[in-house]
Amino acid sequence: MDDKVRWTVSQKILLALTLICFFGFIIYLVVCWNQIPERLVSKYNAGGEVVRYSKKAFTLVPMMMIESILFVIITIISFFPAAVANTNATKYIQDDLNSYKKSALERIRLLTRTIILISDLLFVNLFNTIFLSMIYSGGVLVQHRVTLYSIIGFTVLFAASILFYYFRLRQIMKGHSR
């Protein structure tokens, strides 16, 4: 059986947005490196007071490497949704496979790729938000709230995506189990 899963337009758009956000932020860091303060806030106490500062190279470079590794891994995984979507539907794949079950398996793999791409986009933007909050944490309370709300928003979107995936997968499996 051919494990190739076609790419939908929305998946291509998600991948393009993720690439733009990822490489756009790297370009932003390179261009604005001299304008970034030498010391960045790296830790706050429970009262919201700055406890520790770090040099920008020791803060941004390792975090950028972590983001790059996560980005590459998640993007590679998105090219192989069959490896991730190892559901019970695969046990139906025999020599006498009919198109009904084949289409269910393809829909599961398409859905899996979409959720992986959404996760990739959310993680890249979450890291970028954290970077920006570290760079521009000049004691502006509004900025800290925006960062907090952004992180909460990304978390809610990620949880909603996972729930959507779960319920959609159950619907597909229920409609194709005989």
Could you tell me what each predicted segment is?
Residues 5-21, 61-63, 106-115:
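Alpha-helical transmembrane segments and their helix-start/interface "positive-inside/aromatic belt" motifs
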Residues 16-27, 67-75, 112-122:
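Hydrophobic alpha-helical membrane-insertion segments
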Residues 18-20, 55-77, 147-156:
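Alpha-helical transmembrane segments
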Residues 29-61:
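Active-site and channel-lining beta-strand-loop segments
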Residues 32, 72-93, 163-169:
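Membrane-water interface of transmembrane alpha-helices
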Residues 57-61, 105, 129, 135-178:
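Alpha-helical transmembrane segments and their immediate juxtamembrane interface regions
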Residues 84-103, 176-178:
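Juxtamembrane inter-helical linkers in multi-pass membrane proteins
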Residues 94-126, 156-164:
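Hydrophobic alpha-helical transmembrane segments of integral membrane proteins
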